[in-house]
């Protein structure tokens, strides 16, 4: 097995921490995110080639705020602190931090000193006096006001005189700005230099090698045992299934549960791709009557999610019991899920929506867990899917909620509503593809509204249902903006839906961003 050198990212609670990891991975190097208070023993055993301290919402100027484990500064490896990470490094190494008189949030211009090391020859332009200037993104209320012993200033501006600092001998670097965000144009170059030139990592994190490595790892871990996987047709479970099948072939059995709440022709597409084209063993269970029966009369979104999740567990457990030698349960867990689960153990957060996942399966199954995608971000999962030979349309399909159309039908779920919605949704997606807008949007779907409106078709009055169309663009799904689809495209979609889907006579377009709205309606 290939042993990659790796970067350790310690998370102090920044909204940008995952972006740091994305930038490191994009530079063809491996990294992992762990909480700032991870044990010194773990850090020593992890044996990082370099460490990045993330930003965070706390203030170093206050007592009882997070600090980096002291071992970080004793391992002899390069350390890069970003925003809060820079501040705690400076404070822990003998400098001081204070609340800034002038806070900086947004664009800033820095003057770069011509020091050897991290920022050498990295700049956006020079001014008339040949001073090198760097455009960056700031987001801070505190600043380092006294350098720790051994440090020098790398970059500054009038508002933040110590905007970037360095101890070249120990290879410790701090930046008050955020190199990981796209608003810092030279950010990728800065991270690339830290990872490869300063920490010495090779450019050895690539998908073909990772695929070969994971196939070997799965074979070694599973041995002769049988594996079962709940196949949803979504990107994550599909790529997990293809990867595991590449490794162990017929030892994998997938269970595909049709809950009656899938998209148009989805069951047939999944079976065609996996069973007939890839040769994966798939058990197709039509449980639509069970699911729809238990949803009768239920209007609360959370209650619907719980029922759908519970029914899935019962159906999956029933099918799993029929597979005699199954010892492993495979899941399409990806790295953001792992990070968020770890963060949930130490951070309080309000539940906006519960998430339906195979992870809710009961321990009575007595199966060991196999999560071959748990080291990958979503874009890496898609890249792996293409490397495995999955169809482009499947790999780049928009996200689909675990409860399916159950949370895109407002209020009570009925078979009639599901039929109307899946046909309207299919027209919407088909027209987006035809117009070249599908891949310009991050998620697009139709929502069924259980209200009727008056309409006129021909010479007659109609009184039929309403659907809403939703299309958003986003980098991370934490925030999103509504997609400004051309009016002519919206008109064509609306015309087709009201003419081709009998029972719908009105189409509206959702122009709400996130926040304040969520992407899904329920």
UniProtKB/Swiss-Prot annotation:
Organism domain of life: Bacteria
Listed InterPro entries: Class_I_gatase-like (IPR029062), GATASE (IPR017926), GMP_synth_C (IPR001674), GMP_synth_GATase (IPR004739), GMP_synthase (IPR022955), GMPS_ATP_PPase_dom (IPR025777), NAD/GMP_synthase (IPR022310), Rossmann-like_a/b/a_fold (IPR014729)
Keyword Ligase: yes
Sample GO molecular function, one term: GMP synthase activity
Disulfide bridges in this chain: none
Pathway recorded for this protein: Purine metabolism; GMP biosynthesis; GMP from XMP (L-Gln route): step 1/1
Catalytic residue list: 83 (nucleophile), 178, 180
Keywords attached to this entry: ATP-binding, Glutamine amidotransferase, GMP biosynthesis, Ligase, Nucleotide-binding, Purine biosynthesis
Pfam hit, one: GMP_synt_C
Cross-referenced PROSITE patterns: GATASE_TYPE_1, GMPS_ATP_PPASE
Keyword Cell division: no
UniProt: ATP binding residues: 232-238
Matching CDD domains: GATase1_GMP_Synthase (cd01742), GMP_synthase_C (cd01997)
Reaction(s) catalysed (UniProt annotation): XMP + L-glutamine + ATP + H2O = GMP + L-glutamate + AMP + diphosphate + 2 H(+)
GO cellular component: cytosol
Signal peptide: none
Residue stretches making up the Glutamine amidotransferase type-1 domain: 6-204
Domain GMPS ATP-PPase: 205-397
EC identifiers of the protein: 6.3.5.2
Subunit structure: Homodimer.
PANTHER family noted in UniProt: GMP SYNTHASE [GLUTAMINE-HYDROLYZING], GMP SYNTHASE-RELATED
Summary of the function given for this chain in its UniProt record: Catalyzes the synthesis of GMP from XMP.
Protein name: GMP synthase [glutamine-hydrolyzing]
Species for this entry: Nitrosospira multiformis (strain ATCC 25196 / NCIMB 11849 / C 71)
Biological classification of the source: Bacteria, Pseudomonadati, Pseudomonadota, Betaproteobacteria, Nitrosomonadales
